[in-house]
């Protein structure tokens, strides 16, 4: 009886295992997890609620949510996409809900609903689950099977192996794959918050401005969304998206770089100037601090007036050309020095991993080691926050799990 090993007991690993067993019921499928707990990352996703996918209703181009791997994801979505994910979990008895921001959660609002579903389905299907197994080496055999050697000294031979170990902060952890001839793209963090040390700015802790545009001067990296100011610096969708889009650049800068905030999400400074002139003409006797652009809170507006060296008690009619210029510059190109990175809700996402040039794109099988497949974040695929990383796990897990025969070269 053919044996299939799944290395990694996370979302991609479980989905690969379940679908391998469903597609090939006569096989023996075993999940090997290095820790003593499976699906740990699923349990903390979405703040413990598990943002398992997204409706993609607001996604015009996959590259906007998958900075790396968008073309592969687009190809694989023809096999298993977010609609299939929604249907699959509801068919397993897990009702789902779509929020106004298009993120999808279990109706229970509990990540355990997703984890319990996967474990239950795996056990019902006959998948074996083994914890405390750390893979050290893979050895291709002459008969096309693969021998796995674990840290404990245990060895086993499999007809098919699926690597679903997730993202790794260090390339050395993937050295056993490099030894087989795979290209390993150096992993770097790709979802994190930014540290800003300016005390007056951090005094705005708890305020949200939506939308803003963030950009990194002298680069093409930019993002749009809500900006949350924290005791540490900045967070929120705009920050997290920029951290993903510019992950490698930011790493090369050792997490010390400038960010420009466009508080009005308007790229044309002249348009902002006209908006302010309209406010001045409409409310000439009103104080600057009493009339503000719609998306700015009173606290943020007061701070920006102060940063522009303007007297907040001055009437709009007395703003003047110099004051107008300072205010436009502050609103559209407000520069902050970022001095470090934080984490996002204890979630750790990396860009990097097994290079996509090493795999058959239709099946996720290795080009250098037949019957070795990959699923999830171990591949050089990553996404912005919003359920997109887990969707990549379900999609790649399904494809890797339900494919058995060796791939053909038709991957162009």
What is the predicted role of each segment?
Residues 1-12:
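Beta1/beta-strand and adjacent pyrophosphate-binding region of the FAD-binding site
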Residues 5, 21-47:
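Glycine-rich FAD pyrophosphate-binding loop
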Residues 7, 44, 163-167, 374:
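Redox-cofactor binding/interface segments in oxidoreductases and associated redox assembly factors
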Residues 23, 37, 58-61, 78, ...:
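Residue-level recognition of phosphate/Mg2+-coordinating polar/acidic sites
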Residues 43-73:
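N-terminal glycine-rich dinucleotide-binding loop that anchors FAD/FMN and/or NAD(P) in oxidoreductases
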Residues 73-81, 100-120, 164, 168-172, ...:
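Short beta-strand to alpha-helix junction loop
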Residues 112-113, 117-297:
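Predominantly flavin-linked oxidoreductase catalytic cores and closely associated redox partners
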């Amino acid at each position: 009886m053919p044996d299939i090993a799944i290395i990694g007991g996370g979302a991609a690993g479980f989905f690969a295992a379940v679908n391998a067993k469903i597609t090939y019921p006569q096989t023996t499928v075993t999940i090997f997890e290095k820790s003593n707990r499976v699906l740990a990352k699923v349990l903390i996703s979405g703040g413990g609620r598990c943002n398992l996918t997204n409706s993609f209703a607001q996604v015009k181009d996959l590259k906007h949510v998958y900075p790396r791997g968008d073309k592969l994801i687009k190809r694989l979505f023809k096999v298993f996409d977010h609609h299939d994910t929604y249907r699959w979990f509801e068919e397993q008895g897990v009702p789902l809900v779509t929020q106004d921001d298009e993120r999808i959660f279990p109706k229970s609002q509990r990540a355990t609903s997703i984890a319990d579903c996967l474990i239950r389905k795996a056990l019902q299907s006959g998948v074996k689950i083994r914890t405390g197994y750390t893979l050290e080496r893979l050895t291709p055999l002459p008969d096309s099977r693969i021998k796995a050697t674990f840290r404990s000294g245990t060895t086993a031979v499999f007809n098919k192996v699926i690597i679903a170990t997730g993202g790794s902060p260090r390339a050395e952890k993937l050295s056993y794959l490099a030894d087989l001839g795979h290209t390993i793209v150096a992993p770097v963090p790709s979802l994190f918050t930014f540290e800003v040390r300016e005390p007056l700015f951090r005094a705005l802790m708890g305020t949200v401005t939506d939308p803003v545009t963030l950009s990194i001067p002298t680069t093409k990296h930019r993002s749009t969304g809500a900006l949350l100011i924290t005791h540490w610096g900045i967070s929120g969708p705009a920050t997290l998206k920029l951290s993903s889009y510019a992950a490698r650049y930011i790493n090369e800068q050792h997490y010390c770089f400038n960010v420009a905030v466009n508080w009005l999400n308007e790229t044309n400074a002249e348009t902002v100037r006209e908006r302010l002139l309209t406010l001045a003409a409409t409310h000439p006797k009103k104080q600057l601090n009493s009339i503000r652009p719609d998306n700015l809170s009173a606290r943020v507006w007061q701070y920006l007036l102060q940063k522009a060296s303007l007297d907040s008690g001055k009437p709009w009619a007395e703003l003047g050309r110099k004051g107008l210029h300072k205010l436009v510059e502050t609103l559209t190109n407000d520069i902050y020095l970022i001095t470090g990175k934080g984490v996002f809700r204890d979630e750790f996402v990396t860009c990097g991993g097994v290079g996509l040039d090493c795999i058959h794109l239709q099946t996720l099988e290795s080009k250098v080691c037949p019957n070795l497949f990959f699923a999830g974040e171990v591949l050089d695929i990553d996404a912005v926050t919003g359920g997109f990383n887990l969707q990549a796990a379900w999609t790649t897990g399904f494809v890797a799990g339900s494919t058995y025969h060796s791939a053909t070269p038709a991957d162009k």
